[in-house]
Every structure is written in C-alpha cells, then in structure tokens.
Curated annotation (Swiss-Prot):
3'-phosphoadenylyl sulfate binds at residues 176-182, 251-259. This is Carbohydrate sulfotransferase 12. It is an enzyme of class 2 (transferase). The chain crosses the membrane at residues 6-26. Pfam families: Sulfotransfer_2. It is a single-pass type II membrane protein. Residues 27-420 are lumenal. Keywords: Carbohydrate metabolism, Glycoprotein, Golgi apparatus, Membrane, Signal-anchor, Transferase, Transmembrane, Transmembrane helix. The keyword Glycoprotein applies. The gene is chst12. Glycans are attached at N76, N139, N215, N286, N376.
Amino acid sequence: MAKSRLFCLLVALGSVFMILFIIVYWDNVGTANLNLHTSFSKSLPFQSSEELSTAVTATRNRFVSDVDVFLNSFLNLSTRRSELQSTKAEKMPLRGSSSLEENARGYDWSTKEKLEDAILDQEMIQQERKLNLLQFCGNSSFGFPTKERSFDDIPNRELDHLIVDDRHGIIYCYVPKVACTNWKRVMIVLSESLLDKKGVPYQDPLLIPREDVHNTSSHLTFNKFWRRYGKFSRHMMKIKLKKYTKFLFVRDPFVRLISAFRSKFELENEDFYRSFAVPILTRFSNTTRVPDTVGEAFSSGTMPSFSQFIQYLLDPQTEEQKPFNEHWRQVYRLCHPCQIEYDFIGKLETLGEDTALLLRQLNLDTLFQFPPSYRNRTASSWEEDWYSKLPIAWRKKLYKLFEADFVLFGYPKPDDLLSV
C-alpha cells in the first residue's frame, strides 16, 4: 500500500514538472517567434535622439519605425564591434607548437575574423545610409517635389517599379541603369513567375532571356494590385510594405545619366530613336532634316550629342509633354523613399559587397549565385570629361534637378563641376 501511494505521488510530481516545462518552453519559443517575425531592419532595440525625433515628427508619421530604431541599431553595431575586438585574444590560438598543429589541420582564424569585421562594417554602412535618408526626409528645410505627400497620394501608375515576391516576402524597387536586369532575373527565380520551355519555373537567373526579364508580365508590381484586390489594393500594399523586406539599389545620379545616354543614344535602338532622339534633334540641333530611321541617323552621324540630351532634360517643355523616361527619371520619383521605409539600400559602387550582405540577410545566399555583370563601363571618373564641356549654368541647373537623389542617398555634391 505504501509503495502504491509513493508511486502515485511520483507520477503526480512528474506530471506537474512536465506541465511547467512545457509552459516555460512554449513561452520562450513564442517570444522568439514574435521577435523574429519582423523584418531584419527592426530587429534591434534603440535609444532615442531628441533632434531626430523632432525631424521624424515632421514627416507626419510616414514610417513604421522611428529614428529611435536607427540610432540604437547604429550604437548596438558599434558595441558589437567592440565586444568582438575584445574577445579576439581569447579566440586566437597560442603561437608555438599548438598553432602549428592547428595550421596543419587547416584552421584559418584570421580569415574568420576578417569576415566578421567585414559583415559588421557593412551592417554599419547600412544603418548610416538609412539614417541619412530618414534625416533628410524629415528635414523641413530640405524640400523637393512630392516629398510631403503620403503613400496614399502616390498615383497608381507611379508604383510600377515596386516588384513583389510573395513567396519570400520581398519587395524590390528597380532603378534602370543600376543592375536592375540581374535583380529582375533574381526576382523572377524567387517568385517563380516565369516558366521555361519545359513548363517549369526558372531556377538559374542567367537562363532567363533578356526580353522576358524586362517584360512587365513577368513581374507582379504594385500598380497591378487593383486587378487582384480592387478597392482593397492600397490596404494590401500597406500590409506587404509593413511585413516584407524592401530594398533598392542606387547610383551616383550624374554617372547614371551618362550611362543612360550611352546605352540609349550610342547604340542603335529604333524605339528610343523615334521616341526621344527625333524630338531632341528637332528641338536642339541645327539639322535641316532629321533622319527617318536610327540606321540612317547612325550612317549620317546625326544622333543627339550629350549636350543636346542635357538641354532636353533641362527644358521645362519636356516634362510638360510627358514625364521623364525611367532611365533618367529621378530615383525619388521611381521608388518614393520618403513614403516607403526601405530595409536595405544598396549602391552600384559597392554592388558586390551589398549584394552578398542582402542575400545573406534574406537567407538566400545558398540558393543561387547572383548573376555576374559587366564591369561598370561608365566609371565615376568620367564625370569631369562629360560634364566639364557643358556651360556652368547648365551644370548647376542639372544638379538642382537631381539634388534630392544626391542628398537622400548620401552622394557628395560635385563641387568641382559646379564651380566656375
């Protein structure tokens, strides 16, 4: 009888212990899942800054996160770097016979430390880029067209550069002349939006034909949401903007203009010739007869010059007729960075490092290789060669036209080009 009671007591105690264990376990798991549910841009706690909080208030609460998040993220990254450096001595093997043995076994401690340092550096650069963007979007003394409007004020037709991948929770705003062809290829593979000749989704970005990459039917973009969701389209956009990881890649604005001119006016392109070269030649050249075809124009050497192209951009009549083409339209008009809080800002100047970091943060770095691209054939060092031939007044007007892109994305003002 005593043994029976003892057995029952042990069973009861064991049951209580298991219940407590399950409660504690699921409480921890639930908390972890809750913390991991948000995008990586909101994963770190922050301290506030009075000056930046005032700036954020001026943005009329456009962003989901506030400056506190950015500041403390920046501080936490600095702290992580200090902690990493303080523990290096513990990680490094002692020199002597033991280090010889470990070298023989293939250990490379310095490589690991360099990788950790590089990742921290890249993360800090990201925080700096996002903080710079947030500061100027909230700076009431810095203005540019469309800055003060809300996301709801953006016309549907201007949301056509925001590509959505629902399978992985990603939104990419593509900017022409900034590696967008390869990023579009990646988005097609991730979203499985295009089938190959065998009827299966493409798995290798490089196998996707170029004409399909730029076909609008290959991508789900925000401007198509009204077809799916009708009157709920804006609500669905806001949900995805809040929950998905949003990124874009940018480039020095003046270098981007050179690249656009070279690809659209120094190569034979019949569509661009009729849509843009003919109007430019008609308005800004002394040509008595504009060639009918691009082939005839190249043969006779009557294609627009870079100077005439800049005149076309500066002429108010140009946008009175229709908006800038996407290849030279300002990034703030394509991607609306003061209305959309981007989680990642990449730059063409650091494309390799930024792409590697982004794919790693998205947990996509093991799925595929980012397509290799031609070495940046339009170099930043070309700026002076191309722009110094323009009148100083034109250069100043052009900078004013693209000033928002320079400032928002942290590109230095080209003072050498803007001084007499």
